[in-house]
A protein has these predicted regions:
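Membrane-embedded helix-loop-helix hairpins and adjacent transmembrane boundary segments
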Residues: 2-4, 13, 30, 34-38, ...
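Cytosolic-side transmembrane helix boundary signature
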Residues: 12-30
Length: 600
């Protein structure tokens, strides 16, 4: 109930703003938008209510005794198998080569920064929607959600089912402003909304977020290659990074969108292939469902009792912080939106991505973990195996040589599609908000293109350097969650106030970002600062070294950060004079703005 009460408040807020702006109503276009938004809300409400309250009460099979077989031993023991066959690795290597060739082919006509960053703004909605799936599903997604799916069942979908609450705010309030303002980057928006100082600090926050994200993805792929080939994590990360940057630095956004289209389809097909093979192995969907224990069918497993996966923590870390960051502020996401050939295509892409493809993605990334849990309950896998091994164990047990290689290729697709988006996004921010602002303001487009390519290479190298930092965490899920909870709140709060509160001042924006960053950094060393905001979630164990406190309250740090930043933003705004001499039309939410654009 907590999630739907808080999330419902955000949804209603968005609907009210959309109505006052002219986006929804009883007219033909407004009524269609109203039905769409309410349909999205109704779908998630019914689905999550069923999973939380009805599904756990349905019949469940008793835990069967594990029967050891050569196949099951090979699936769970790296020394006896677990690493595929020669055919699998031929397929995996071939996939690497195909993606590089495709990326270079589609980027061969790229001649300007407009092409490099936005692909000439010529793409249809379906291209953008499917390529966004590949960006949304990182390599970490398969592993971390399979791990949580094995431990906590269907509640692993919580991250992918939080976006309904922002649907009206994103589609009807932010998207028109973003598209018609024609900004090239998120920091540029802050520069237009306020001044160059705010733009600078927004650039710092965004670059830290995106470079860290590159590091998370490379760390994940290093873990995968360590499991499969016995490679050192760092070596595996370097190899994959070099392959990814090889086509991004050459082809830019055109290469990214076209390769991600291919990889998005690959991810969906392979993900459902895993589910289909697993359900067939068990003997049908009924057997699969019966062997998911009752608690594993809940969409919210526990509220605050388990510090490793509290639903309230996931809500604050992912639902309120990271979802806004990814959907509204992620430079890679923004560049996809702005690559559309029209606003109508942009809007269709967002709707298709959030309403149709995201629920499918939730099944794709968590499916192997659910299968592993059902297989363990059925006696096909040991129930005490490590959760981090569930993806490998389930997929190897149910697949034949060649199919396992296809699954490995899908993981590579997930990694490369996320990393290539991030690399291109970092290049855009660096060129537009750093190089042109502080290093060489009058450079030609050709020079900017060269800088963009060099930045892509540099961003990859910095991401590689970040890999050892994430190696300190127990799991990929913890590393990703702790990172996003720590770095997103200052920019998220600043953005929300900037977009929806005209009174919000430049000084308040600066204070929110700077003090927010300092406050969150302080919580690394004094985690007890988060206790009043923890909603009863246990602190958890500290890690080793100077930054050991990062592992404590790893999800609830987002609640602390959002609360502190909100308080700072409000106080400083009322302590500073309103900025009344600036025309903010088209930069903030305004009554009737959507209607004035004459769009449906």
């Amino acid at each position: 109930m907590y999630n739907f009460i808080c999330g419902g408040a955000v949804f209603v807020f968005g609907m009210v703003l959309a109505w006052r702006q002219g986006s929804i109503g009883l007219s033909s276009g407004g009524f269609r938008n109203l039905c769409l938004a309410l349909g999205v809300f109704g779908f998630y409400f019914v689905l999550q209510a069923f999973l939380q309250y009805e599904a756990p009460l349905m019949d469940s099979a008793e835990q069967a005794e594990y029967v050891s077989t050569p196949e099951s031993r090979a699936a769970v023991d790296p020394e006896q198998g677990y690493r595929g066959s020669i055919v699998d690795y031929v397929i995996m290597a071939g996939y690497f080569m195909v993606i590089v060739v495709l990326g270079m082919f589609f980027g061969r006509k790229m001649k300007s920064t407009e092409d490099f960053f936005f692909g000439g703004r010529r793409f249809a909605w379906w291209l953008i929607a499917f390529s966004m799936i590949a960006t949304t599903i990182g390599s970490y997604s398969f592993l971390k959600y399979s791990s949580k799916g094995f431990q906590y069942g269907l509640s692993s979908t919580q991250t992918y089912s939080n976006d309904w609450m922002y649907f009206p705010l994103l589609l009807f309030c932010w998207l028109p402003i973003l598209y018609f303002s024609r900004v090239m980057s998120i920091p540029e928006y802050f520069g237009k909304r306020f001044n160059s100082k705010v733009r600078f600090w927004a650039t710092v926050c965004l670059l830290v977020y995106m470079v860290g994200y590159v590091g998370v993805n490379l760390f994940t792929m290093g873990k995968v290659l360590q499991h499969l080939l016995g490679w050192d994590i760092f070596v595996g990360a370097v190899v994959v990074a070099l392959v990814s940057v090889s086509y991004v630095s050459r082809g830019g956004q055109s290469s990214v969108i076209m390769t991600d289209l291919f990889q998005g389809v690959m991810l969906l097909v392979t993900g459902f292939l895993i589910l289909g093979l697993g359900i067939g192995y068990l003997g049908g969907f009924d057997v699969f469902w019966e062997n998911l224990p009752g608690d594993s069918r809940k969409v919210f497993h526990n509220f605050n009792s388990d510090p490793d996966f509290p639903s309230v923590g996931i809500f604050w870390q992912d639902g309120l912080a990271n979802s806004i960051m990814f959907g509204f502020l992620h430079q890679g996401t923004i560049m996809r939106y702005l690559s559309a050939r029209s606003f109508k295509d942009c809007k269709k892409a967002v709707v298709t991505h959030l309403v149709v493809l995201m629920p499918l993605a939730a099944c794709v990334v968590g499916g192997a973990g659910w299968l592993a849990k059902a297989l363990a309950n059925h006696g096909d896998l040991p129930s005490n195996m490590e959760a981090n091994d569930s993806f490998y164990a389930a997929t190897q047990l149910i697949s034949q040589p060649g199919i396992f290689g296809l699954i490995l290729a899908a993981m590579i697709a997930a990694l490369m599609s996320t990393v290539d988006t991030l690399i291109t996004a970092i290049s855009a921010v660096w060129v537009n908000d750093v190089h042109k602002q502080y290093i060489k303001k009058d450079m030609t487009d050709r020079q900017a293109l060269t800088v963009a390519r060099l930045t892509a290479i540099a961003a990859t190298l910095v991401g590689i350097i970040m890999v050892p930092v994430f190696m300190n965490f127990d799991s990929i899920y913890d590393a990703h969650g702790a990172f996003t909870a720590a770095v997103t709140p200052p920019l998220v709060v600043t953005f929300v106030f900037s977009l929806f509160w005209k009174r919000f001042t430049a000084k308040a924006a600066l204070a929110t970002m700077i003090i927010g960053l300092v406050a969150i950094a302080a919580s690394f060393f004094v985690p007890s600062l988060i206790t009043p905001f923890a909603h009863g979630v246990p602190m958890g164990d500290a890690g080793d070294g100077l930054f050991g406190g990062v592992k404590q309250y790893k999800f609830m740090r987002a609640c602390y950060g959002l609360s502190v930043c909100t308080l700072v933003g409000v106080i400083v705004t009322f302590l500073t004079k309103p900025e009344t001499n600036k025309d903010l039309t088209g930069l903030i939410w305004q009554k009737g703005y959507y209607r004035s654009l004459n769009i449906d």
